[in-house]
């Protein structure tokens, strides 16, 4: 396969990027949990170490029909879906998630009870994830009680083309062996979520 210019001229990104959105839970401001790649620590803190990351290479079809290997960031999203009255799968509305998770602007007591691992009556981002059947069943039961049929978690991964942070000269990839060897960039792994 031919390679896009960006493949050699964007060998690494020197900033964090979204890795995943977790809409199976809500933060207190009704947002999903977000995870970033390319940073050690909280991306909102100036003390976190930015490490950057190497984008994954995927096939891209240009408008002229040419297929090229090009750099992408992969973003994984997790979310609740349910079956509507016609049997069609639909995403659970934010309003319904808010109803399941909150009472009077705070986490509902049954949510705190099942998610609060350290028993301090608050939920940290590390606790606020569905990592047990008890947590999943609690949220599922609350969504079912709202009239949603067969609520369950799904996920999808979307590729986002990288066309910025172009380098030139000695910072671009100038060695064919970077891709043409047993540890090729083409077959490198990229973590999809935490």
Placement of each model-derived feature along the sequence:
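C-type cytochrome heme-c attachment and multiheme electron-transfer modules
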Residues: 1-194
């Amino acid at each position: 396969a031919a390679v896009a210019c960006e493949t050699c001229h964007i060998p690494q990104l020197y900033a964090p990027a979204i890795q995943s959105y977790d809409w199976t839970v809500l933060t207190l401001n009704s947002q999903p949990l977000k995870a970033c790649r390319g940073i050690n620590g909280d991306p909102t803190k100036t003390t976190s170490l930015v490490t950057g990351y190497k984008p994954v290479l995927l096939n891209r079809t240009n408008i002229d029909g040419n297929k090229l290997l090009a750099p992408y960031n992969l973003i994984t999203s997790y979310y609740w879906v349910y079956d509507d009255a016609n049997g069609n799968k639909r995403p659970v509305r934010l309003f319904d998630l808010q109803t399941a998770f909150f009472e009077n602007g705070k986490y509902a007591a049954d949510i705190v009870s099942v998610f609060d691992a350290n028993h301090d009556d608050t939920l940290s981002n590390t606790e606020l994830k569905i990592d047990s059947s008890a947590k999943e069943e609690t949220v599922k039961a609350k969504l079912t009680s709202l009239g949603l049929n067969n609520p369950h978690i799904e996920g999808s991964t979307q590729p986002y083309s990288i066309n910025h942070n172009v380098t030139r000269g000695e910072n671009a990839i100038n060695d064919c062996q970077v891709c043409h060897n047993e540890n090729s960039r083409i077959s490198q792994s990229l973590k999809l979520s935490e």
